Each structure stands twice: as C-alpha cells, then as structure tokens.
C-alpha cells in the first residue's frame, strides 16, 4: 500500500527551504504586513517538549496562510538565554554558562527545524549576544535619564539558596521562590528599581485598545489594582507625630476603633512606649522572615503587638490604640490602615482576638457574630446618618478636605519593579559609582558593557553579584583621576524579553535599536501566541518598556501586541493508586485494557496530569518525528481540540493523524487526476475552501482539519479527481502539513517551486448551493420512488417528471388518477383509485 515516507520527504524539503531562503521576510511595500510572534523559549538543557510546538505550529499555520494570501510575513525565532539554570549548571560543573547556552540553542534549533516551521532565521536573536544586549543596556540608560530607573534601600525577597533577590511576581503563594521552591525572606538591600508605577494608569487604560483574552486583561487589572478613596491624617496622642492612612471607605471613619501600622513603618520606633519596646522589636524580627504573600494570607492566624500609643480619630476625637501587624505591608498604600472591625472581616477577626472595640456604622447584620460587609445606610455617623454609600463617601471627602485632615486619592496596588539581581549570568547594568558619591550611566559609545568571562561565578555572599570578584573589570578611573566601581548587579531575565519583538524587525542594525521606518511598517505585532503563565510578568513589563519607548519617540505605537492568544497545555498521562498518589509510567503495566502497578499489582486509575520528569510521562518531539513524522505531530496537535484547551496526549490520536496523512498522500498520488470537472465535488470542494479559510483566520484549526477530512472522504468516492480541486486541496493542507504539501504540489505541478507563495485558493459562492434536489413520490401515502431533479422546478414540471418515472408508471398502470399534489423541492403525492 502506498504511504507517505516522512523519513525521506521531510528532510528533503527542510533542506530546500534552507537552501532557497524560502521564508525570508517579504519587503514589498505594496503588500499588507503580518507579524506573527511566538514567545521565544529559554533554551534549557532538556530541549523542546511536545508542549512547545503547539503554539509554534499555530503561528506557523497563520504565517504560511498569510504568505499565500499575499502578505509580507515576519515570523522570527530567538532565544531568551540569560537566566538562573545556566548559571546553576555552570556552578555545578565549572563550565562557562555561555558554552552550555550555545549547546542548548543548537539543540533547540535542530528540534525546531525538524518540525518544519517557516521561521526567517536571518532574524534570529539571542539575549546573551553583546550585539543584542547593547540595546537592552541602552534602554536602561534611557530609563535612568528619565528618572524611571533609580536606586533604593528596599526590603527585598531574598532567597539564600539562589543567592539573589527576586521580584514580588516571582514569589509563589506559599511564600517560596517560583524557581526552585526555596524559602523567601525579607531583607533590606540596595537595589535598582524601575518606576513602572509612573505608567500605572496608562497600562490600565490601554488594555481597552488590544484584542486579548478578557481573563488576561483582568489579571493585569487586578495586579495594577486601582483604588479610588481618600487619604486621612491621624495625629498620635501626646506627640507632634502623625501618620496618613489610605482608605477606599472614608465614609466608615466613625467606625474606626484602632489603627495598624506595618512593622517596617518609619513611625513605629518613634511612637513605641518603653514597656512595649521589647515585644515590638521581637514582632518586627519575626515579620522580616515572612514574604508579603505569606503575611497577607487571609486564612492565617492574626498576629500583632500594641505600640503603647494612641491615635486621635479626626472625625470624633476618639482615642484609637495603634498596633503593628504583619498583614499590613509597608509597600502597599501608606503602610498604615484605619481598622473598621464592624465592616471588614480581617479587622473583625483581629479585634475579636485582641478584644478591641467594634462599632457598627452601617445598618444591617449583627456585628457581634460577624463583620457586616454589605452596603447599608449609615448609622452612628453624625452628619452621615441615613446616607447611602456613594453620598456618604462624597460628603466625608468634602469634610476631610474642608478640615484639612484628608483629601481624595487614587492609589495602585502595583509596586515599582525590582530590577537588579545578584547573579553573574545576566546583562551588566551600565552604571558606574564614583568615589565622589556620584553615579553615571556608561556612555552610548561604550556600549555594550560586555559581561566579563570568569570562572568565579559563585554568589559573593555579601549580597553583591559574582562580578564583585572580577577586579580588573570592576574598577575604573575617570579622565580626572576619580576612581569608580561598576555596578555589580545584573538585570533580570525579564529585561531581554521586554523588547525582543522590536529587534526582530531590524536585527542587524548597529546604529540604533531598530530603524524608525521599519518599526512603523511592522508594529504592532499582529498575533502573539504563548502560555497564560506570562499574563502579568512578561506582558506587563513589555508593555511598560514599549510605552517608555513610545514616549521617547522610538516606537510608533502605544501597545506592542495587538492580539494575544494563549494556547492550552498538553497534558501527559498519569496513573493514581487508591490513595490518590501518582505512579510513574515505568511502574505501570497494561492488561486487558486496565492498568496495574508493576510491583504491588494494585489496579490504577488513569488520569491526565502535567508532564513531568518525575512521572516519566514527558513526550519528546524527536521521538514523535522519528516514528510518525513532523507533519503528523503538527496535524495531531492542531486536531486535538480547541487551541486554548488543555488536552491529554494520546498515542491513538497521533496514529489517527498519521493515517489521515497517508490517505491524503494516496489520494493525490494514486487517483487519476483529470482536467475535466464532473461537478461531483463542486459543493464539497468550495465548502472546504470557504471553511478552512475562515477557520484558519479564526485560529479554529481543529475544525479546519475536520473539513479537510470531509473533502478526502468525498474525493475517495470518485473515480477521478479534477486537477484544480486536487491543487486547491493541497494548498489548503500545506500550512498544517508543509512537507507533505510541498511534495504533493510537485506531484501535481512538477514546478520545482515552493508552494509557499502560490496564491491561496478562492471559492465560488454559487457552487456552495446544491443545483439538484431529491424529491420523493408518494402513492396512497407510501413512498414509491425518489427522484433527483433540478432545483426549483415548477409544480407542472415536477408533476410531469414524476408521472414519467418508470417505477411510478408501473404503480399507476390501469388505475385512475384522482389528483396530483406537487410541492416544489420536496415531494409529489399521487392519489389513485
């Protein structure tokens, strides 16, 4: 039986594409543009897994589709190659992280090329290449010049095992580090910060301009966390001190019965009384060991210590004890809160635990039993009594401003971005600290500031990066003899990935980040495909940098990515025992359709789970390509289900996709191809062109493949295949299975040219409608014949055709026809006796 020999055909076409630079980005200014971007990978030692190609295949199908539709297509790939794993490997082995990274990139590239993706490799970028990070450093110097990069002594999330501080976004909900799962402690350190907060409102507003999943927009909105309310100033009794509180509910001020400061608040030591000093100091020490997420966990037990001082409630003169508690963060709001325990669950629990007053100021609920957190009319609130929430807030803000003890205020949950890392394998921050106390940016003419090669890359232990050990790089002298030290912190991995999509547009430019005209031509990115796990971090950082570059006149658009699509996760197969514990696949055997533990004999339940090394359920694309072919892997991953769904990997599904491609190969190579159109496939062919065109455009790849299958089934029923339909079908399947598409195109045309730029097939609307219909002929209410007739025949014509039919004539011979009822396009009913 004829079958598709992927082992010969796929390498042949991969070599053809490489030799002919088939996918070089088009530059014809008269054509529309299409910029299809993948989230570039970190080139790990493990190589690609089958989850990577899912998103890559989607953008590749779109890129091939748009090329055939006459677009200039920019479809690049590169490497997000700085980062901790390479440094960790280097420390463990003594090898240079650059060598390890280069080997990993070569392996990733081999794997990617084996999958037939149509990348323009002339535009490849690597974030660890000095010619690339020259411009990462240049962007940093611009941030510095604009006052958006600054140094501050800040409590950081310090991870002892990693020897570095990490950003808030990299701390998991359980208070451990995203990388490695290590404990995170709070520690004050000199750090570089980026003032992303200066862009909070624009980052929020401009989400309206982009076509992104609403869930991702919501995650960014929540992270930015805009709140409108009021600042209220509280004086500390018997002192000249005061503190400010931000509240979204100034209308509940009459119910504020105590205040809470963050343990790190600057006022704490100044207002703590002598008899409370030891307890306060102990509590501050304990709080410093917890991450922000652990401190604000709603489920945790409430802890706190009284400072011994009282604040004066400005609205009624009542004394309010001032406490410190770790659920209040110095970095959020003003680092101080007014507690209204009657109407806030956390304040209520705290008040109950420490026997503090609870005064209801909203009607409804029983505050002895629980906090009342719904809306109600105001009570116990003097001039606010009887007012609803909106009216009371407005009136209280007016009162605060008139009395000079508060004002209306908008705040954001978003914090400035902690940008420095105490590691070696990252972009050096281009700043020099001089002995006269000044700091300057490295001039543009001296960029890139190249990372020095050194064997000594262990963390210094002092909080500085290993670069502090490289004396000849570290120490510099100015023309006037003043000595200086280079900044030893390096940039986080997020730096290079915050702008890489811009460098793809003009990757070899030595004079500037990218040419303005080219940026105008290609921005914004038309489709960006990647995992939803980057919803806040990477996407927010990239949007921030893009807006800064927009303000500098470097880029012409406010937003970088017009449309974002998150592919789902490809899950592996896992097995669970009766206790619910996961069992590795090499400990499982299949018998009679059931699964059993090899050692215990216990029957196991099969369930999908994230692929992991420990479960031994990771599928390597190399193995799939070798056994089934790249086209099979591509078609299978697109046919599994909707692109954004998480679906379990299945060998049976893979085999089904391979059989489909074999059927396609046989159809084109063994069926007689004719120049005459019998018309039998008119409708299904035109339906297929229409459906595949629309569904690819909407990224509904699974339903597009289903329609291709419909055509193959219909075509296989015919003796011959019309040449134009054969060619059109091959064009439709080529974006999904490009090696097969190229091979079959040569079978049909022998053109010697790639199918890639052959204009996409069009469909004939008139052929979508059936020209013939089947009608039934009933005699005495029973169906006696079925006739295929031209559509829309008149009653008279229909009657004539029915009565002329041989079967009908045999039934009515010798009978009297009483009447004939003809319903066009449906039936003919003959009444006889």
UniProtKB/Swiss-Prot annotation:
GO cellular component, one term: cytosol
MF (Gene Ontology): aminoacyl-tRNA deacylase activity; ATP binding; leucine-tRNA ligase activity
Pfam families membership: Anticodon_1, tRNA-synt_1, tRNA-synt_1_2, tRNA-synt_1g
Record motif 'KMSKS' region, residues: 610-614
One GO-annotated biological process of the protein: leucyl-tRNA aminoacylation
Keyword check for Lyase: no
HAMAP family in UniProt: Leu_tRNA_synth_B
Name of the protein in question: Leucine--tRNA ligase
Species whose genome carries this gene: Streptococcus pyogenes serotype M28 (strain MGAS6180)
């Amino acid at each position: 039986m004829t079958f598709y020999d992927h082992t010969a055909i796929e390498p042949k076409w991969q070599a053809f594409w490489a030799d002919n630079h088939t996918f070089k980005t088009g530059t014809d200014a008269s054509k529309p543009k299409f910029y299809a971007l993948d989230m570039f990978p970190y080139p790990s030692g493990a190589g690609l897994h089958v989850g990577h190609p899912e998103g890559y295949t989607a953008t590749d199908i779109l890129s091939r589709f748009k090329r055939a539709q006459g677009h200039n297509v920019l479809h690049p790939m590169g490497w997000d190659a700085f980062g901790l794993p390479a440094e960790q490997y280097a420390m463990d082995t003594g090898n240079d992280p650059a060598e390890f990274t280069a080997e990993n990139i070569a392996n990733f590239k081999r794997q990617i090329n084996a999958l037939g993706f149509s990348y323009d490799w002339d535009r490849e970028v690597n974030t660890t290449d000095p010619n690339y990070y020259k411009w990462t450093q240049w962007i940093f110097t611009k941030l510095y010049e604009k006052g958006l990069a600054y140094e501050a002594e800040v409590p950081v999330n310090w991870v002892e095992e990693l020897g570095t501080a990490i950003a808030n976004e990299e701390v998991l909900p359980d208070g451990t580090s995203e990388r490695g799962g290590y404990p995170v402690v709070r520690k004050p350190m000199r750090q570089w910060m980026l003032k992303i907060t200066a862009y909070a409102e624009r980052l929020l507003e401009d989400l309206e301009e982009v076509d992104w999943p609403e869930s991702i927009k919501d995650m960014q909105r929540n992270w930015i966390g805009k709140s409108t309310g009021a600042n209220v100033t509280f004086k500390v009794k018997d002192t000249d001190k005061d503190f400010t509180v931000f509240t979204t509910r100034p209308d509940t001020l009459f119910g504020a019965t105590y205040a809470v400061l963050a343990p790190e608040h600057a006022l704490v030591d100044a207002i703590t009384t002598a008899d409370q000093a030891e307890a306060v100091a102990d509590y501050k020490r304990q709080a410093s060991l917890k991450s922000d997420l652990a401190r604000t966990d709603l489920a945790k037990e409430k802890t706190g210590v009284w400072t011994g001082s009282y604040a004066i409630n400005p609205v009624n003169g009542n004394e309010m004890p001032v406490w410190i508690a770790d659920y209040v963060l110095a970095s959020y709001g003003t680092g101080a809160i007014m507690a209204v325990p009657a109407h806030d669950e956390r304040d209520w629990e705290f008040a109950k635990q420490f026997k503090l007053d609870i005064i209801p100021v909203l009607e409804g609920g029983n505050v002895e039993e629980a906090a009342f957190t719904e809306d109600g009319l105001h009570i116990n609130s003097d001039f606010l009594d009887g007012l609803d929430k909106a009216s009371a807030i407005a009136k209280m803000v007016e009162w605060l401003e008139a009395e000079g003890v508060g004002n209306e205020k908008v705040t954001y949950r978003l914090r400035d971005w902690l940008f420095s890392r105490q590691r070696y394998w990252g972009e050096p921050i281009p700043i020099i600290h001089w002995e006269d106390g000044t700091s300057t940016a490295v001039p543009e003419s001296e960029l890139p500031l190249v990372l020095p090669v050194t064997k000594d890359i262990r963390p210094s232990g002092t909080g500085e990066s290993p670069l502090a050990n490289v004396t000849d790089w570290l120490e510099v002298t100015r023309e006037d003899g003043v000595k200086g030290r280079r900044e030893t912190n390096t940039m986080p991995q997020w730096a290079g990935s915050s702008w890489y999509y811009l460098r793809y547009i003009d990757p070899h430019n030595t004079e500037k980040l990218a040419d303005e005209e080219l940026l105008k031509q290609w921005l914004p990115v038309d489709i960006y495909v990647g995992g939803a796990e980057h919803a806040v971090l990477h996407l927010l950082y990239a949007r921030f940098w893009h807006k800064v570059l927009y303000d500098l006149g470097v880029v012409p658009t406010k937003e970088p990515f017009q449309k974002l699509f998150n592919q789902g996760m490809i899950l592996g197969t896992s097995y669970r025992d009766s206790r619910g514990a996961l069992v590795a696949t090499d400990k499982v055997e299949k018998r009679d359709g059931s699964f059993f533990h090899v050692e215990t004999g216990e029957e196991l339940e099969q369930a999908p789970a994230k692929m992991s090394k420990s479960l031994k359920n990771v599928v390597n694309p190399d193995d799939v390509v070798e056994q089934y072919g790249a086209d099979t892997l591509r078609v299978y991953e697109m046919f599994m289900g909707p692109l954004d769904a998480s679906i379990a990997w299945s060998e049976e599904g893979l085999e089904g996709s391979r059989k489909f491609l074999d059927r396609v190969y046989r159809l084109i190579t063994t069926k007689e191809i004719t120049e005459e159109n019998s018309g039998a496939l008119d409708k299904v062919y035109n339906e297929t062109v229409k459906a595949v065109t629309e569904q690819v455009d909407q990224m509904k790849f699974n339903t597009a493949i289903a329609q291709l299958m419909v055509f193959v089934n219909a075509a296989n029923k015919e003796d011959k295949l019309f040449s134009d339909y054969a060619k059109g079908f091959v064009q439709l399947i080529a974006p999904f299975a490009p090696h097969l598409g190229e091979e079959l195109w040569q079978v049909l045309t022998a053109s010697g040219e790639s199918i890639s730029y052959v204009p996409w097939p069009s469909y004939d609307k008139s052929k979508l409608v059936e020209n013939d219909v089947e009608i039934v002929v009933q005699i005495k209410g029973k169906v006696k014949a079925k006739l295929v007739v031209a559509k829309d025949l008149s009653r008279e014509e229909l009657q004539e055709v029915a009565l002329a039919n041989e079967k009908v004539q045999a039934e009515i011979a010798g009978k009297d026809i009483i009447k004939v009822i003809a319903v066009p396009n449906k039936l003919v009913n003959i009444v006889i006796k």
